[in-house]
Amino acid sequence: MSIKEKLASGQNVYGTMIRLQRNPAISFFAQNAGLDFLLYDCEHGSYNFETLHDIFVTGNAMGFDSFVRVAELSKDWISRALDCGATGIMVPMTETAEQAKEIVKWAKFTPVGDRGYGSGLAHSNYKGGGKHVDVMATQNNRVVVIAQIETGLAVENADAIAATEGIDVLLIGPNDLSISLGIPGDLMNQIEIDAIAKVAAACKKHGKAFGLHAGAKMHEIFKDDEQFRMLSTDLDLLASGFKNIKETLEQI
């Protein structure tokens, strides 16, 4: 069952963000652990498309989803990431319905969007030409489109963003949201919680998946609302793993 099918049936999906790891084998570790996806960060990470291509091809071959947070809303970023084999796109700082429509425009083929057709690339498992209709339909059905909500303006426009055809998930970026709301880093402030609740309500109203990439305390608050669940990063996992080695050995 694809991630979009899981979300449509009311199931939760689980993943984390990758900012450092470049070995395609990471997809095996994530799949073995029961995760549904990994999301590679091109907004704050240093990935290039050549590296991402190799990771995505591996994931696709084993039936594991690889998503990308692109650096910005643009045809170049979205279309190239998808042609490299990404099965989901997240655009940071999505603030308006107009921006949401532009995301869909570049992420979806006609009749939903205007994504350009690159023949025989990773997204079609390198199958040659003559399969346009099939490839386009498969991609439109599979690719997950995520609008990241990170500002007060985005919260104000959450209803319109959630109503946009082709947007599958609205995912909260709690750190930047707290900065925009004038409470930088105070993620459990009621102002932040209330803002996030408005986004969750908009998702429920329009039948879109609500997502969080946050700590355990915030997940606890919104556990009945969220479907697209993200915790931690590869950096956090490395740091905590090394710390655990030292602490464990000291106690023996």
Task: Identify the role of each PLM range.
Residues 1-17, 129-141, 197-205:
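N-terminal amphipathic alpha-helix/helix-capping segment at the start of soluble metabolic enzymes
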Residues 1-66, 70-73, 105, 145, ...:
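Conserved N-terminal beta1-alpha1 strand-loop-helix module at the mouth
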Residues 13-15, 36-37, 65-67, 87-90, ...:
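Structural preference for beta-strand elements that scaffold enzyme active sites
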Residues 28, 68, 73-87, 91, ...:
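Catalytic cores of alpha/beta
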Residues 49-83, 105-113, 137-140, 188-211, ...:
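Alpha-helix-loop-beta-strand connector modules within alpha/beta enzyme cores
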Residues 55, 97-113, 234-252:
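C-terminal helical cap(s) of enzyme catalytic domains, especially alpha/beta-barrels
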Residues 76, 88-165:
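Conserved anion-binding
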Residues 86-88, 109-119, 180-193, 232-234:
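Glycine-rich tight-turn/loop motif centered on a GG-T
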